[in-house]
Amino acid sequence: MLPPININKWIEENKSLLQPPVGAKLLYTDIDSTFVVMIVGGPNQRTDYHVNETDEFFYQFKGDMILKIVDKDGSFRDINIREGETFILPGNTPHSPQRYRDTIGLVIEKKRSSENIDKLLWFCDNKDCRKLLFSRSFHVDDLDLGKQLTPIINEFYGNEENRTCKHCNHISQKPTVNDYIQ
């Protein structure tokens, strides 16, 4: 059993690791647990929507964030999670965490079984369209989710065909860090 971790000290010592595009680092790496505990820093550069079959717990440690979601009825909405607030996201809810510069959050997810499949989805960013552009399913086989997301994010942005909407012909562009600064 590991000793307790001083989160403030851990953040100070590991701040340089909380970098775009995902900015997530595991808080615990040497334990066999049911949970994956991550510290996530901003800004991020994500426009994807992640789908995890299990619930996710968010605690906004420093600064505010926006959790963009797609409801069961297909409508898009934003959930504001302010500094000091927590939120539990139900499993199978497409979500896109939007973190701004100098923000830090804690995210707890259930460790995936061999049957659990995650997805990354991108929707047309033309607000009058919002059709699905691109998706990838994958099994989280490494506790470091950020390591697995980055190649898929790069695959999406690396090919204009992936970013071109077949319904309205809009081409989604890769965001810059400045797009996520308040």
Swiss-Prot record:
Catalytic activity, as annotated: 3-hydroxyanthranilate + O2 = (2Z,4Z)-2-amino-3-carboxymuconate 6-semialdehyde
Binding site residues for a divalent metal cation = C124, C129, C165, C168
Instruction: Write down the species.
Output: Dictyostelium discoideum
GO annotations of cellular component type = cytoplasm
What does the record give as the function of this protein? Catalyzes the oxidative ring opening of 3-hydroxyanthranilate to 2-amino-3-carboxymuconate semialdehyde, which spontaneously cyclizes to quinolinate.
List locations, semicolon-separated.
Cytoplasm
Highest taxon of source: Eukaryota
Q: Which Pfam families match?
A: 3-HAO (PF06052)
Q: Which gene encodes it?
A: haao
Q: What is its main location?
A: cytoplasm
Task: Name it.
Answer: 3-hydroxyanthranilate 3,4-dioxygenase
